[in-house]
């Protein structure tokens, strides 16, 4: 009976019934095989014992004898008998006829009623094996031995006594398992174009030529291996022919590299003798167990890189141990211990194998402990490493060591009596000295509040002027603006103490202020220090602070007699500012502000007379003048002694005349002239 699909030319081909072997579940295949000597013949016979309407085909080649084909079929019939009876899940292809396991090819062309060959690969790439299955073919066999997930496949060349280790890798050239091949499928029809990936050790087409010799083409050689593996990594494969080497470079596709230097996981090649007596099910079970063991071993993914052989990995090229996918180990107790995940296409090296192949020492990442503790790397544990690690500790020790050496009594004296915690006036509320405030803002406030490497603010300042000019108030407001602790010490009180006690107190003050930065120390009446030893100690402290730009420490000294300061001590001040008495506008502002609660009843002429008479008064003395005038106004009102007045009356000009008799300025004209002359020479 002639099949309507079989061409007439195929019926003339030679066919020997000895090579016919019925298959239970393989669909109809029509092959047109070209041969140099003779043409193969195909003949289909309906296998009536099967109820599913399957066909059995016999195929023969004139290149081998019938006896050789019978021996080969007998040898592999027992091996594949159990696999052929297993059910095969056919893919749904709509209205097409039922295809075989891999589809059919007719003379290299797909018939219009047959679907395209399907594989088990989900990425749509070409299969590792040809999309057809041939029956009763002798010669070497190419059988996949991979039991890994889709995308990873192993190929082994099988013959009578040959075994080859399958090279595996993350590839889309994944063919079906050995259970899905016909009993005597020959690798002759396996073209190199079916496998675009370099991960499979698939020999070229010339390796699969039909030979009566049962060995695997001893004449096959190549000069350029597909992978640039080191010679020490892969042992000699005794099962292969002596002249057989890896496939040539043309099997590598252009978009992919030949082989990365770093390969994933601690994978090893397993030499499996597929051509032996071990069944394919055992091979698949072994490969599956090896895959599970590799997945369970987290440490194999975090080893040093080397040229370890590859092994079947997961279906994803990037293996992340952590389920969250963020690269951090979930079982780590170290909150800062980062364990990077390496891709499965890379391999790692055991700790004892470090430097075995590369000859270099491994780079050990620095260990970070909890609470910010830092441990230097192994390369920094020498002198440099210890210095870098102890920099912050040494700096803290420098700050804390002076505090430990301070006498507790002196420390308590500085903390309780010398530290001034009284509220300071706002910088904008300071009356008078507008030019001095502007100079301090430019020289000190802006460089401190907005640091600039090119601008260094002054660390030692001298404020000189008559008594009551507001030098202390200005210094206190300045410390409040820069957010520094304020310490105040009178040099007149310091000079009255014993020499040893005065020096110890001065040293304690500077030590505490240095340890509690930012800080400001105000030394008033600095001209009172006449003792040589105490003056030299103060001079040494000022020079130390002046040349150390990293400290947030400011020293302000005030004096009303700058002419009495020694020149050696005077040179220790970076800036010198003259704080004079308030002028007419400042005095007017102070008087009106002080009289605002009761109201000012003075006329403009009377107010001008009061301002003219108050020349030489300081701000503090002007406030005393206003208070005395208010008291005089309250006393002149006829109010009973024990009764409260309805409202306080505003002072009159007569009240101010009475106040001038009781409040007098403390600065002398000689003192004012001295400060003015000294300011012209030494003031900045």
UniProtKB/Swiss-Prot annotation:
Gene3D superfamilies noted in UniProt: 1.10.8.60, P-loop containing nucleotide triphosphate hydrolases
Transmembrane segments: none
Keyword Repeat: no
Tissues/organs with expression: Highly expressed in vascular endothelial cells and neuronal cells.
Chain intervals with Low complexity compositional bias: 160-179
Claim: ATP-binding is one of the keywords in the record: yes
GO CC terms: cell cortex
Region (Disordered): 27-48, 99-179, 292-403
SMART domains assigned: AAA
Localization: Cytoplasm, Cell cortex
Annotated keywords: ATP-binding, Cytoplasm, Hydrolase, Nucleotide-binding
Reaction it catalyzes: ATP + H2O = ADP + phosphate + H(+)
Protein name, entry field: Fidgetin-like protein 2
Gene this protein is translated from: fignl2
């Amino acid at each position: 009976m002639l099949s309507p699909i079989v061409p007439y030319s195929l019926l003339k081909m030679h066919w020997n019934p000895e090579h016919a072997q019925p298959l239970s579940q393989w669909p109809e295949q029509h092959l047109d095989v070209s041969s140099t000597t003779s043409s193969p013949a195909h003949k289909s016979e309906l296998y009536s014992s099967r109820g599913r309407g399957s066909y059995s085909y016999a195929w023969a080649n004139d290149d081998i004898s019938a006896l050789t084909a019978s021996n080969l079929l007998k040898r592999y019939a027992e091996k594949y008998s159990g696999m052929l009876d297993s059910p095969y899940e056919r893919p749904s292809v709509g209205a097409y006829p039922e295809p075989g396991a891999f589809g059919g090819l007719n003379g290299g062309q797909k018939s219009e009623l047959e679907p395209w060959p399907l594989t088990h690969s989900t990425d749509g790439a070409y299969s590792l094996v040809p999309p057809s299955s041939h029956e009763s073919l002798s010669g070497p066999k190419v059988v996949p031995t991979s039991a890994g997930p889709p995308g990873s496949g192993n190929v082994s060349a099988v013959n009578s006594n040959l075994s080859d280790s399958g090279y595996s890798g993350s590839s889309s050239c994944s063919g079906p398992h050995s259970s899905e091949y016909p009993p005597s499928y020959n690798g002759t029809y396996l073209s190199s174009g079916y496998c675009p990936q370099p991960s499979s050790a698939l020999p070229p087409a010339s390796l699969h030529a039909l030979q009566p010799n049962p060995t695997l083409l001893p004449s096959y050689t190549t000069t350029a291996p597909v992978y640039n593996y080191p010679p020490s990594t892969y042992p000699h494969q005794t099962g292969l022919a002596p002249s057989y080497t890896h496939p040539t470079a043309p099997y590598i596709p252009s978009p992919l590299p030949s082989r990365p230097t770093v390969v994933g996981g601690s994978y090893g090649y397993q030499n499996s003798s597929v051509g032996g007596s071990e069944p394919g099910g055992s091979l698949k079970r072994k490969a599956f167990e090896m895959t599970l063991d590799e997945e369970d071993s987290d440490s194999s993914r975090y080893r040093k890189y080397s040229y370890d052989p590859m092994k079947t990995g997961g279906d994803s090229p990037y293996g992340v141990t952590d389920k969250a996918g963020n690269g951090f180990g979930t079982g780590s107790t170290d909150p800062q211990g980062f364990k990077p995940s390496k891709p499965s296409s890379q391999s790692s090296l055991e700790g004892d194998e470090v430097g075995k192949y590369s000859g270099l020492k491994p780079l050990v990442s620095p260990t970070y402990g909890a609470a910010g503790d830092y441990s230097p790397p192994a390369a920094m544990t020498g002198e440099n490493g210890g210095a870098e690690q102890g920099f912050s500790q040494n700096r803290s020790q420098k700050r804390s060591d002076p505090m430990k050496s301070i006498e507790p009594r002196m420390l308590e004296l500085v903390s309780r009596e010398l530290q001034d915690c009284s509220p300071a006036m706002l910088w904008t509320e300071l009356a008078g000295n507008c030019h001095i405030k502007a100079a301090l803002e430019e020289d000190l406030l802006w460089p401190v509040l907005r640091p600039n490497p090119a601008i260094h603010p002054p660390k030692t300042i001298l404020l000189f002027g008559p008594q009551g000019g507001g030098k202390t108030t200005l210094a206190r407001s300045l410390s409040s603006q820069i957010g520094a602790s304020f310490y105040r010490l009178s040099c007149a009180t310091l000079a009255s103490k014993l020499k040893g006690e005065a020096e110890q107190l001065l040293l304690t003050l500077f030590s505490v202020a240095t340890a509690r930065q930012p800080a400001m120390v105000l030394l008033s009446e600095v001209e009172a220090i006449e003792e040589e030893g105490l003056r030299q100690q103060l001079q040494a402290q000022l020079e130390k602070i002046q040349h150390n730009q990293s400290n947030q420490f400011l020293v302000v000294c005030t004096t009303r007699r700058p002419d009495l300061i020694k020149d050696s001590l005077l040179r220790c001040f970076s800036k010198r500012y003259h704080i004079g008495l308030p002028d007419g506008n400042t005095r007017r502002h102070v008087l009106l502000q002080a009289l605002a609660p009761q109201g000012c009843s003075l006329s403009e002429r009377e107010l001008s007379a009061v301002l003219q008479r108050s020349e030489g008064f300081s701000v503090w003395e002007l406030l005393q003048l206003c208070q005395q005038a208010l008291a005089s106004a309250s006393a002149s009102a006829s109010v009973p002694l024990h009764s409260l007045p309805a409202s306080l009356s505003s002072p009159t000009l007569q009240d101010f005349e009475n106040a001038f008799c009781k409040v007098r300025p403390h600065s002398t004209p000689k003192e004012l002239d001295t400060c003015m002359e000294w300011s012209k020479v030494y003031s900045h």
